[in-house]
Amino acid sequence: QQLITFVSQSVLDFLPEDVKVSQELQYTLIKDDYYKGTGNQVLAMNNGKVIDVKKQQVTILDENGTEITFSKLKDIQVKKFQKIKQGDTIALYQQKFKMIFEYLGKQITYQEYLGM
């Protein structure tokens, strides 16, 4: 967990300290950690940086230090270490996609994330 915190803080050094988090983009919980949006695009909810990209999965470290892992994706449109802005397209999905939120090494819910 110390390594994750160190890496998270190192990656976030490029971001300004006093940034207001906007929660304009929201998704609907289907079941468990599966969500859907209004279209077929997964959009970044906040500014941040892509810290991992796999076959159907992207992990983003956002400006408040939360790691968001999106999975069950199609046509990933970001690359590892790419800076992203709120509203940028991360990937596409078909019927649903999975989102996992982790803050300071602890998994949090989507609702907790929105309240940050």
Show the residue positions of the predicted features.
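Small beta-barrel nucleic-acid-binding modules, principally OB-folds
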Residues: 26-36, 66-69, 97-98, 102-105, ...
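Surface-exposed, glycine-biased beta-strand/turn segments
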Residues: 1-57, 61, 85-86
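Conserved, short, structured surface segments that act as functional micro-motifs
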Residues: 80-116
